[in-house]
Amino acid sequence: MDYGLQEGSRVLILWDGQVKADVLTELVRRIQATVKDDKLCQVENSQQLGKSHHQTSSFDAVLLGAVTPDMRPTSDCLVDLLSLLKPNGKLSLQLTKTDLDCDKLVYNLKLSGYVDVSMGSSTDLVEIKCSKPNYEMGSSSKLPFSSAVSSNQKSSADVSKIWSLSAQDVLDRDVELVDPDQLISEEDFKKPDPSTLKASCGGEKKRKACKNCTCGLAEELDKEAAAKVQPKSSCGNCYLGDAFRCASCPYKGLPAFKPGEKIVLSEDQLAADS
């Protein structure tokens, strides 16, 4: 397989599993002879790739499976290799056909960010070549919108003027406007009857005010409860004074008061005499 190496290229050989020393030694010798520098060829186990601390964008080519073609690269491994390659760097894969899903591998390569993916095969091996894009992953580029000259400047100017037109400029004579004074009638300004605003809290069952009641039912129930506690006279003369009160009158001992005046009695006064 032609790896497309040149003099000065920095190469990473990736292996996994059981490696034959003579095969690895021969491959390293061939690559060193091509790049003309022994230090430019490095060998790495794929299992230790994340711990190797290689600099990003530091390799011109990565050879995967050239020594151990039975290896199967994971998606994480492909992403890590992409970060190690320089822009336009090459990734070459040589893998055995046994239990190899070529379509899935090509899909994972494209999904990881590789471009120019091409596949070939020999008797026992599948050979795949791909490249890193000619830019760094995550880099940004300014689009030349500001320098572009519009071919239809007059049309653009007319479009921009539309936003500055007033309502009278765009209205047709046949279009009838709604009179804003007719949107709200006199009935809308009338204050509603409070009785119509009360909610049917509880329906026909025992009325119970809701929590944080706003319809007035809570105040009404409080008044009813206070009226039940307030003692009522059976003779109607309690307000005149003790001379007109019965012996069991709860107001006994209190000064005379006006009819309808609210009198607060203590619990001792409400208790029956023993």
From Swiss-Prot:
The UniProt record lists the keyword DNA-binding: no
Chain location of the short sequence motif Cx2C motif 1 per the record: 235-238
MF-aspect GO terms: 2 iron, 2 sulfur cluster binding; 4 iron, 4 sulfur cluster binding; electron transfer activity; metal ion binding
Protein's cellular compartments: Cytoplasm; Mitochondrion intermembrane space
Binding site for [2Fe-2S] cluster: C201, C210, C213, C215
Residue numbers spanned by region Fe-S binding site B: 235-249
Motif (Cx2C motif 2): 246-249
Function: Component of the cytosolic iron-sulfur (Fe-S) protein assembly (CIA) machinery. Required for the maturation of extramitochondrial Fe-S proteins. Part of an electron transfer chain functioning in an early step of cytosolic Fe-S biogenesis, facilitating the de novo assembly of a [4Fe-4S] cluster on the cytosolic Fe-S scaffold complex. Electrons are transferred from NADPH via a FAD- and FMN-containing diflavin oxidoreductase.
Subunit structure: Monomer.
UniProt protein name: Anamorsin homolog
Source organism per UniProt: Ixodes scapularis (Black-legged tick)
Source species taxonomy: Eukaryota, Metazoa, Ecdysozoa, Arthropoda, Chelicerata
